[in-house]
Amino acid sequence: MTVYTMLADGFEEVEALAVIDVLKRADYEVKTVSIQDKEVVAGAHNIGIVADLTWRRTDFDQCDMIFLPGGMPGTMHLKEHAGLAEQIREFDRQGKWLAAICAAPSVFGGLGILEGKKAICFPGFEKYLTGADITPELSLIHISE
């Protein structure tokens, strides 16, 4: 399985890198993708990460899952990216995997793809998970079908 981790300036470094590390240890292929037109993406704490791919060089036919790390203003940049929104909607239509952490599930809520699905997010972001069954008692790792 190939996972594309979407990075935008202001992403939360630990949310991106810890997930990437766990996925790689589980033998997933993980590619970092800068949604901007630059390879180095600055995290919320100004740590620069060199992305494997930039948006224009990304082939989503090679991807099985899109993962969105949270962080501010990174989550807002993800929300504002029209191309990413289109890819997320297409993945949802195809029943492909979509994952997000902390504030980033709000991107899915804004696209209306959480209707009738269980979701969890950073406290205070529940109002952005439009249509979701908010389940704060879920564990940190949850798979909902």
Model regions: which residues?
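Extreme N-terminal starter segment of soluble prokaryotic enzymes
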Residues: 1-4
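Short N-terminal binding/cap micro-motifs at the start of the first secondary-structure element
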Residues: 11-16, 40
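Hydrophobic residues within alpha-helices
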Residues: 18-19, 87
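Catalytic nucleophile loop
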Residues: 66-70, 88-114, 122
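Conserved small/polar residues in nucleotide/adenosyl-binding loops
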Residues: 141-145
